[in-house]
C-alpha cells in the first residue's frame, strides 16, 4: 500500500470511530453550546474515543490516550498508535479536535505551534491529524452536531495536507480557514511548505520589530518633551 492510500485508511478509521460516537449520542451532547465551548466538546470526544477503542478493540489502532484534564498546553487532544503490517507502518499519531460553531462560517482556528511540530518530527514521528466538526445550539442550549455539505459529520485531515493559504500567525500558530479544502502532498513536500511558511512568519515579525525599533527615538523624544512639560507644571505648582 502506498503512502497516500495508508493515510486515507488512517483518516477513514478515525472518522468512522468519531462518527460512531456521535451516532451513539444521537448527534447531541449535553454541553451548553456557547461560542467557546470547543474545549468542553473536545474533552467529551476524547473520552469517547478512548472508551470506544477500549470496548471495541481495533485491528490497527491501539494504545489510545486522551489529553490530561486541565492541561492547557498539552500537544494533543488525543493520541494513538497505528499499525499496518502490510505497509510496515507502526507509529504514534497525535489527534487535534476542532469543533467549530456553525455561525462562525469564516472560522480560522489555531492549529498548533511550529515548535510543537518540529519537536514531534525530531522525536521520530510525523503525523498530526485534525478532526473537524461543526455544531450549533439546540433550543434547550445543548450541543447539536451538523453534517458538512457532503453529508458527513466528521472530516479528518492531516496537517501535511493543509491548504496552501495556511499562515503562521504571530503567536505563532498554524492558521487556516476550516472550509479550505485539503491538498495532498508528500511528507517531503510538506516540510518544504512548512519551511516557507515559518520563514515568512519570522520575516513578518522581524519587519514589525524593526519598524518599532526605527520609531523608538522619535517616540522617546516626544515623551521627553512631555516629561519636561510635566516637570515644569509640577515645579510651577510648588
Predicted feature descriptions by range:
Residues 1-74, 80-93, 99-238:
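Nucleic-acid endonuclease domains
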